[in-house]
Amino acid sequence: MTTALYLPEENIDMIAATSVLQQQAADIRTRTINWASYMQSQMISEEDYKAISALDKSRASFLAQNSSQVVKTLLNLVSHLSKDSTIQYILVLLDDLLQEDRSRVDLFHDTAGKLKQCIWGPFLNLLNRQDGFIVNMSSRILAKFACWGHETMPKSDLNFYLQFLKDQLASNNNEYIQSVARCLQMMLRVDEYRFAFVGVDGISTLIRILSTRVNFQVQYQLIFCLWVLTFNPLLAAKMNKFSVIPILADILSDCAKEKVTRIILAVFRNLIEKPEDSSVAKDHCIAMVQCKVLKQLSILEQRRFDDEDITADVEYLSEKLQNSVQDLSSFDEYATEVRSGRLEWSPVHKSAKFWRENAQRLNEKNYELLRILVHLLETSKDAIILSVACFDIGEYVRHYPRGKHVLEQLGGKQIVMQHLGHEDPNVRYEALLAVQKLMVHNWEYLGKQLEKENENQKQGAAPIAGKA
C-alpha cells in the first residue's frame, strides 16, 4: 500500500493548462481513429475492436459495465500497436480515465493481476520512444499507477523510472520539463519512493538545476520536491549536506513570486522541525543565519501576505534563528561558514584568539572542516574563497603542531602550492603566506631558535639553523 503524504489539492493539481503536454493532449482528443482498419488488417482482435469503439462512443457507461475488458483492451493496444498518432490517442484516453476517477488505478492493477499481465512493462517500454509526447504521457500514467493505487512500483522498475525522471530534468531545453517535474512531485509524496530517489542521486540533480536560471514555475515545482522530501525526518536531517540551504537562501533573496517564497519558507521550517536530533536542527538554523536568511525574513515581515502560512512561517523562522544567534559560538559560526562552502573574510578568520583556541577542532569528525577547505582549494573558482581557504590552512598549521603532517596526508600541501601561480594577486599572496607557514614545524620553536641564533652571533658562535 502506498503511503502518500496528505497535501492540499491546490498544491498538487495534475492539470497545468499551460504545459506543452496538456496543449498537445487537447489536440489529440479531437482525433478520430479508424479502428475498423486495424481489425481488418488483423492488427487488433475483434474483441478489442468492439471494446475500444464502444469506449469512444460512451465512455462512462461502457466502462462501468465492462471494466475488465476495457483494461485488457487498453493494455493490449498499448503493447501491440506502434503508430505514434494511435499510441498518443490511447495514452490520452487512458490518462483521462484515471484523471476522472482515481479508483480506476486499482481497477487496472487488479485486472492486470488476474490476467497475469505486468501493468508497468508496456509503459516503461514507451519511455524509450522518440516521440516526446508519448514518452511524457507514459511517464505521467506511470506516476499515477505508482501513487494512486494500493500497489507500489517494484524496486527495479522504480529505480529505472526515477533515473529516467532525473535524466529528463537534467536534459537541456526539455520542453516537457514541467510535466517531468509534475511526475516527480507525485512520486515523492510517497515515502517509500523518497529513499529510492536519494539513491539515484536525485537531490544533487534538483540542487544543480535550481542553481541555474530556470523559470519560476519549474523553480516552484523542484523546491516542492525538496519540501516533500523533508517530511521524512531522516532525509530532513541529511538535506543540507547537498547545500540546500545556501541555494534556497539565494533564490529567496531574488524571489518575486509569492508561491516560491511560500514553498522555500516551508522547506526551511521542516529543516528545523522534522529532524529528530536537536543538534541537526541547530546546525540548520546556524546555516540559515550564515546565508543571511534573517535579513530576508526581516524584509518579509514588512510585507503583507494574503497567505497566512507565509506569515506564520516568517514568525516561526525569525524566532528560531534569533535564538540560534544568541547561542552561537565563534566556532559554530566558522564551521557553518566552511560547510556552506561560501568563505568570506568574516571576523573569525583574522582572530588570533580564535585560532589559538580552535585550530585543533578542525580535526573533529575525521578532519571534516579541513577536508572541506582542501576541497574548496581544489574546486572553487572564486578568488575570495581561495584566499580565505589558503589563510585558514596556514593558521591551522601555525597553531596545531601536527598540522603540517595532517595536511600532507590529505594532499593539501601540494594543492596550496599550486595556487602560488594563480592569476589573482590576492590568492597568490595568501598561498605564499600559507606555504611559508607550512615550511615551519612550530612557530614558537622558530622564534626561540632565532633568539638563540642572535645570542650566539653576539657571542661569536656558529648560528643554529631553524628547521624547515
UniProtKB/Swiss-Prot annotation:
InterPro entries in the cross-refs: ARM-like, ARM-type_fold, ATPase_V1-cplx_hsu, ATPase_V1-cplx_hsu_C, ATPase_V1-cplx_hsu_C_sf
Keywords, comma-separated and alphabetical: Hydrogen ion transport, Ion transport, Transport
Any one Pfam family match given in the protein's UniProt record, by short name: V-ATPase_H_C
GO biological process assignments: determination of adult lifespan; lysosomal lumen acidification; proton transmembrane transport
One cellular-component annotation, GO: plasma membrane proton-transporting V-type ATPase complex
Disulfide bridges in this chain: none
CDD domains, sorted: VATPase_H (cd00256)
GO molecular function, one term: proton-transporting ATPase activity, rotational mechanism
Electron transport listed as a keyword: no
Summary of subunit composition and partner proteins: V-ATPase is a heteromultimeric enzyme made up of two complexes: the ATP-hydrolytic V1 complex and the proton translocation V0 complex. The V1 complex consists of three catalytic AB heterodimers that form a heterohexamer, three peripheral stalks each consisting of EG heterodimers, one central rotor including subunits D and F, and the regulatory subunits C and H. The proton translocation complex V0 consists of the proton transport subunit a, a ring of proteolipid subunits c9c'', rotary subunit d, subunits e and f, and the accessory subunits VhaAC45 and ATP6AP2.
Family: Belongs to the V-ATPase H subunit family.
Function: Subunit of the V1 complex of vacuolar(H+)-ATPase (V-ATPase), a multisubunit enzyme composed of a peripheral complex (V1) that hydrolyzes ATP and a membrane integral complex (V0) that translocates protons. V-ATPase is responsible for acidifying and maintaining the pH of intracellular compartments and in some cell types, is targeted to the plasma membrane, where it is responsible for acidifying the extracellular environment. Subunit H is essential for V-ATPase activity, but not for the assembly of the complex.
The name this protein goes by in its record: V-type proton ATPase subunit H
